C-alpha cells in the first residue's frame, strides 16, 4: 500500500462567512460536523495511518531568512491506499467541506526517499 498526505484547505473568505452565521446555527452545525467527522474516521480507520491535526500559523524559511507567511492549509491526515485515485475517493463528501467551511482536501502521494 502507498501512503498519501491529505491536506485540508480552507480560505479566509469561507471562514469569514462561517463566522457570520447565526451562533446557535453554527454551534449545531459544528456538533453535527464533529459527529460526521467521527463517523468518517470510523469508516476509514483501516486506511488512516495518522489522524493528523489542525495546523497553526506558518513561518517561511529561505536563503533570505525567516518570515511570517500565510497559506490555506488548515490540517492534515495521512492515509494508505492502493492508488492515488482510491486515496482521493476516501475524502469524497468529507465533513471538512460538506459541513465545515473548508474548501477542499488535496491528496498527494508520499514518495520513498531517494538514496543519498
Language-model features and meaning:
Residues 1-116:
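Conserved, structured core segments of small domains
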Amino acid at each position: 500500500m502507498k501512503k498519501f498526505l491529505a491536506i485540508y484547505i480552507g480560505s479566509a473568505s469561507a471562514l469569514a462567512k462561517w463566522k457570520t452565521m447565526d451562533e446557535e446555527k453554527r454551534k449545531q452545525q459544528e456538533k453535527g460536523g464533529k459527529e460526521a467527522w467521527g463517523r468518517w474516521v470510523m469508516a476509514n480507520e483501516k486506511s488512516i495511518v495518522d489522524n493528523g491535526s489542525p495546523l497553526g500559523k506558518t513561518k517561511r524559511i529561505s536563503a533570505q531568512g525567516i518570515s511570517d507567511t500565510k497559506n490555506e492549509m488548515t490540517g492534515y491526515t495521512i492515509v494508505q491506499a492502493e492508488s492515488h485515485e482510491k486515496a482521493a475517493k476516501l475524502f469524497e463528501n468529507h465533513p471538512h467541506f460538506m459541513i465545515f467551511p473548508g474548501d477542499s482536501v488535496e491528496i498527494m502521494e508520499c514518495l520513498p526517499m531517494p538514496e543519498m
